[in-house]
UniProtKB/Swiss-Prot annotation:
GO MF entries: ATP binding; metal ion binding; protein-exporting ATPase activity
Source taxonomy: Bacteria, Pseudomonadati, Pseudomonadota, Gammaproteobacteria, Enterobacterales
Pfam family, one: P-loop_SecA
Keyword Cytoplasm belongs to the record: yes
Full protein name: Protein translocase subunit SecA
Chain residues that bind ATP: Q87, G105, E106, G107, K108, T109, D512
Ranges of compositional bias, category Basic residues: 891-901
SMART domains: SecA_DEAD (SM00957), SecA_PP_bind (SM00958)
Gene that encodes it: secA
Membrane topology: Peripheral membrane protein
NCBIfam families linked to this entry: PRK12904.1 (NF009538), secA (TIGR00963)
Subcellular location: Cell inner membrane; Cytoplasm
Induction (UniProt): Repressed under conditions of excess protein secretion capacity and derepressed when protein secretion becomes limiting. This is regulated by SecM.
Length: 901
């Protein structure tokens, strides 16, 4: 109550921010007459003037009024479009490192030109980030004439562009591209083998369109560049045959309940758990199929990979549904984005899940991949000096933007008042009753000439509604991932009188639905339209537009509540743009996923008390409130998952930054011999210490072991035993110096054969390659550690602290391995002639390029299955990385359980 009173007196933080910015808008408006008097050349010259002022030390913020006035005037001359005052406000919000919430149809694309121009004046580059290539290309081409008029260059960063074209795109003042491509380029730059191979500049200012989609919906999706791992497709096929024999039971076994089934599914956590009966049956079936030896347990360390296959297959069958989570097209399993309903070509689930789904669907199983480099969007976008974003729906996620990205959200008012009617939800007992009610509503609306947009949450649901509409004889268009190509055409004509369009979630985001249809699309369909034809099309459109407005504007029907209120608001936001009339309503049933998982018992009880009859709907504030609470529960759960993911990724991020900084320093120098000499001293000291403990008695020295180690690991045959026999007075210090000196002399003799320049080149290559190889193995080991770390909670330890502690030890061990392997490789190298070395170098580069091409955006599950706890017992012999694994698999230790330790 007190907060409400204070807000009334002083205004909210949002009101105060807008009040401050409106003063600047008045200054910009005051400059308009002076700008109108300038000639084109004088207006263009302003860019050079601003840049000169910045070079002399003027602050960018001081240029806002003048720079915005220049862009507004240029837009009037180039496009015939004048920025509204609210768009100027939006531009200032975006320059202030904030999120601007601007409703659909308020002209976000034009608003973005203001801060993009202002920040490009610094010459450090501006990255405009969109959700797909189509929008990046569209926005870049639409705004190019304006920026080029003002003397700014525009680049488009598309996937598949060759490196020189990418470098050119990044060198432009303003670059348009997708979030994936910017992230991948960052990772690829950090896998480059020469400074010339890098394409990005320093990350300066990112302006993110549909910021909620990229920074929140995509936050759990790490970008992963991967290379091929071992082929285990046959194992996926074998395990897949076993799963149909298992029976699902409703809940997990406990002290009070023992079911008859073999596995239970936790829909909320998206986990599958085997019961005792299930484990026994699985083991029997695996033995029958000859996959596992009789008498073995699925949980024994030797079967850890088999357990991984079983878990992946179970999840593929129990949690992932065709036409909801993925579609099968041209013999390929393609993921469907749960937030937008779009297909995500080229993305694959990780942890063998994608292969398990391929086995389930009987399509070709593609090889598993090994991570070479990865980063989450959360950590990538936090690398920018300055970050801002815009969307139609950010207010519900304001807390997350603030706590994770340190970005405040400012709600920018609409240019015209919003008059859309949002009606209360209608709740039915069954799905069938709900669908019937939707059909009746559509009939009523279309009879009056009102266009209808039906939003569904999956392809499967959109096809159910489509079938019912076909039965009822209602003509309609379906917009889902299967009909991706015709998306823009369908959206353009969704505002026709009595048009019915079914859309999965919000496929088609970024394109406005014009009431009466799009006259621009009709003009574009003609080859060489005459002025008369264009006038006639416009006149016809005006008649249709007025008819649709009179009928009540676009009507939105939601067939189900989404987990997030934000996605529901996006659907509603398709109607009522720019002050147009419109209406919206959600139809729900007790069989909907959200209601079943989160709100079923309370709401079902409420509905029974109110005496529900079949076909009857309930429309009550209590029910709407219960649903909103359910959504809040899911949102806060998802926020916790994302926050936890970030806390864990922050540990990896610190290590990533250290490795990439080190790598870039290596790339930028041509001579690393000083580093090599320093490392050699450390490595030889540690090697000798292992066999001759410092300040120890001669009886404790293991001379034979030292000789063998020097020969095997450093190709150095030294008669140490003879030296000691011949020279009884040989001290430990002198012996150490002699061994190191011998190593240095042997290395120098090799250098004399190939020449210093070639040796420096080779040293750098070995360091980079070894660093990449060990970093790749370290990423896999961190993955395993992350998956099983939650089990430490049972020992009353904080999993996050344990993860930090262990990952730091692993990182330190990796750096020691790096030193050792670099010196070992350089010592053992066979000297060849310069031409041969150059040929091998070329071959290595080609291999590196091939791996970099095999990029893959992986969907990391939020609920990674826990790995077996294989903590090494203290006191056991330390196994060498290249020794056979003690588990008996026949693999090298580093490729088997060494990845887990």
């Amino acid at each position: 109550m007190l907060i409400k009173m204070l807000t009334k007196v002083f205004g909210s933080r949002n009101d105060r921010t807008l009040r401050r910015m409106r003063k600047v808008v008045n200054i910009i408006n005051g400059m308009e007459p002076a700008m109108e008097k300038l000639s084109d050349d004088e207006l263009k010259a302003k860019t050079a003037e601003f840049r000169a002022r910045l070079e002399k030390g003027e602050v960018l913020e001081n240029l806002i009024p003048e720079a915005f006035a220049v862009v507004r005037e240029a837009s009037k001359r180039v496009f015939g479009m004048r920025h509204f005052d609210v768009q100027l406000l939006g531009g200032m919000v975006l320059n202030d490192r904030c999120i601007a919430e601007m409703r659909t149809g308020e002209g976000k694309t034009l608003t973005a030109t203001l801060p993009a121009y202002l920040n490009a004046l610094t010459g450090k580059g501006v990255h405009v980030v969109t959700v797909n290539d189509y929008l990046a290309q569209r926005d870049a081409e639409n705004n190019r004439p304006l920026f080029e008029f003002l003397g700014m260059s525009v680049g488009i960063n598309m996937s598949g562009l060759p490196a020189p074209a990418k470098r050119e795109a990044y060198a432009a003042d303003i670059t348009y591209g997708t979030n994936n491509e910017y992230g991948f380029d960052y990772l690829r730059d950090n896998m480059a083998f020469s400074p010339e191979e890098r394409v990005q500049r320093k990350l300066h200012y990112a302006l993110v369109d549909e910021v909620d989609s990229i920074l929140i919906d995509e936050a759990r999706t790490p970008l992963i560049i991967s290379g091929p791992a071992e082929d285990s497709s046959e194992m996926y096929r074998k395990v897949n045959k076993i799963i149909p024999h298992l029976i699902r039971q409703e809940k997990e076994d406990s002290d009070t309940f023992t079911g008859e089934g073999h596995f239970s599914v936790d829909e909320k956590a998206r986990q599958v758990n085997l019961t005792e009966r299930g484990l026994v049956l699985i083991e029997e079936l695996l033995v029958q199929e000859g996959i596992m030896e009789e008498g073995e347990s699925l949980y024994s360390p030797t079967n850890i990979m088999l357990m991984h296959h079983v878990t992946a297959a179970l999840r593929a069958h129990a949690l992932f549904t065709r036409d909801v989570d993925y579609i099968v097209k041209d013999g390929e399993v393609i993921i469907v984005d749960e937030h937008t309903g779009r297909t995500m070509q080229g993305r694959r689930w990780s942890d063998g899940l994608h292969q398990a789904v391929e086995a389930k669907e009987g399509v070709e199983i593609q090889n598993e991949n090994q991570t070479l480099a990865s980063i989450t969007f959360q950590n990538y976008f936090r690398l920018y000096e300055k970050l801002a974003g815009m969307t139609g729906t950010a207010d519900t996620e304001a807390f997350e933007f603030s706590s994770i990205y340190k970005l405040d959200t400012v709600v920018v008012p609409t240019n015209r008042p919003m008059i859309r009617k949002d009606m209360a939800d209608l709740v039915y007992m069954t799905e069938a009753e709900k669908i019937q009610a939707i059909i009746e509503d559509i009939k009523t609306r279309t009879a009056a000439g009102q266009p209808v947009l039906v939003g569904t949450i999956s392809i499967e649901k959109s096809e159910v509604v489509s079938r019912e509409l076909t039965k009822a004889g209602i003509k309609h268009n379906v917009l889902n991932a299967k009909f991706h190509a015709s998306e823009a055409d369908i959206v353009a004509q969704a505002g026709y009188p009595a048009a019915v369009t079914i859309a999965t979630n919000m496929a088609g985001r970024g394109t406005d639905i014009m009431l009466g249809g799009s006259w621009q699309a009709e003009v574009a369909a003609l080859e060489n339209p005459t002025a008369e034809q264009i006038e006639k099309i416009k006149a016809d459109w005006q008649v249709r537009h007025d008819a649709v407005l009179a009928a009540g504007g676009l009507h939105i029907i939601g067939t189900e509540r989404h987990e997030s209120r934000r996605i529901d608001n996006q659907l509603r936001g398709r109607a009522g743009r720019q002050g147009d009339a419109g209406s919206s309503r959600f139809y729900l049933s007790m069989e909907d996923a959200l209601m079943r998982i989160f709100a079923s018992d309370r709401v079902s009880g409420m509905m029974r008390k109110l005496g529900m009859k079949p076909g009857e709907a309930i429309e009550h504030p209590w029910v709407t409130k219960a649903i909103a609470n359910a959504q809040r529960k899911v949102e806060s759960r998802n926020f916790d998952i994302r926050k936890q993911l970030l806390e864990y990724d922050d540990v990896a991020n610190d290590q990533r930054r250290a490795i990439y900084t080190q790598r870039n320093e290596l790339l930028d120098v041509s001579d690393v011999s000083e580093t090599i000499n320093s490392i050699r001293e450390d490595v030889f000291k540690a090697t000798i210490d292992a066999h001759i403990p410092p300040q120890s008695l001669e009886e404790m020295w293991d001379i034979e072991g030292l000789q063998e180690r020097l020969k095997n690991d450093f190709d150095l045959e030294l008669p140490i035993k003879e030296w000691l026999d011949k020279e009884p007075e040989l001290h430990e210090e002198t012996l150490r110096e002699r061994i190191l000196q011998s190593a240095v002399e042997t290395y120098q003799r090799k250098e004399e054969v190939v020449g210093a320049e070639m040796m420096r080149h080779f040293e750098k290559g070995v360091m980079l390659q070894t660093l990449d190889s060990l970093w790749k193995e370290h990423l896999a080991a961190m993955d395993y550690l992350r998956q099983g770390i939650h089990l430490r909670g049972y020992a009353q330890k904080d999993p996050k602290q344990e993860y930090k502690r262990e990952s730091f030890s692993m990182f330190a061990a990796m750096l020691e391995s790096l030193k050792y392997e670099v010196i070992s490789t350089l010592s053992k190298v066979q000297v060849r002639m310069p031409e041969e070395v150059e040929a091998m170098e070329q071959q290595r580069r080609e291999e590196a390029e091939r791996l970099a091409q095999m990029q893959q955006l992986s969907h990391q599950s939020d609920d990674e299955a826990a790995a077996e706890d294989l903590a090494a017992q203290t006191g056991e012999r330390k196994v060498g990385r290249n020794d056979p694994c003690p588990c008996g698999s026949g693999k090298k230790y580093k490729q088997c359980h060494g990845r887990l330790s």
